Amino acid sequence: MKRLAKSAFLATAASMLSACYQMPGDAYRLAETRQTYASETFGEVVFSRISDDVVMHTSTLDLPGMGPVRSNGLIVIADGRSILVDTAWSDAQTRNILDYAEQVLEAPVSDAVVTHAHQDKMGGIGALKAAGITSWAHPLTNSEAVSQELLPAERTLTFDRGWAVGPSRHQLAPLAIYYPGGGHTVDNITVGIEGTNIAFGGCLIKGSDAQTLGNLSDADVRNYASSARNFGAAFPAADTILVSHSPPQGRRAIVHTIALAERL
């Protein structure tokens, strides 16, 4: 299989912090592992190997007044296929992702889930539709997509106590999809990967060195902190936290996001 080399980690430097942030029913470990991941560019998109079966895709769009903004999503490989978590900014970039999964990873994308109704997460839905790939989203995401001038996903997720249930549970395995409540947007969902220590906080969770919570134009400011806590509690064993706009993080990113949100 033409994957990135299994020795994907070029260098690892670990810095352990012993403090913890206490919350009801949980204690957040602040252990941070900073790693340099093997990466390669395919078309307009950069691909970084996080584990044998998880690849992070990074696409960039030049936004007026902001300059180039990078956005991360995932390709999760399972049983000879792959599942896409978030599209790129555009259809063209998303086609690069689909081609990479098929030609390089030899694991064509069968399904995709988008984590909220912003362009960096679902701007490539058109490419998925053209390729016949089933796309899934929170019901609020599909309703919000119209107001954001975005194409909605093809199917709607069903949730029970925060967790996605029903047909998507099998179709999107090994993803464990969790709605923590509103934060970055009212519809933001998060993703754990069963059998790993990896969770994706999307745009809800910020990097541990972030100065702000970023774009709050569609935010649920009142519930942001509690939703970030819910994410951490939902995936207590995850110590590799992937986020939309920073390199891979440790659990400190969750604590830092909560602290930023409590200042709102």
Model-identified regions with their sequence ranges:
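Active-site metal-binding motif and surrounding structural segment of the metallo-beta-lactamase
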Residues: 80-82, 92-136, 236-237
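Conserved beta-strand hairpin/beta-sheet module of binuclear metal-dependent hydrolase folds
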Residues: 49-98, 190-203
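C-terminal motif of bacterial Sec signal peptides marking the signal peptidase cleavage site
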Residues: 17-19
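Acidic/histidine-rich helix-loop elements
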Residues: 58-71, 147, 209-218
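Metallo-beta-lactamase
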Residues: 42, 49, 89-90, 127, 139-256, ...
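Bacterial signal peptide processing site
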Residues: 21-24
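Bacterial N-terminal signal peptides that target proteins for export
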Residues: 1-9
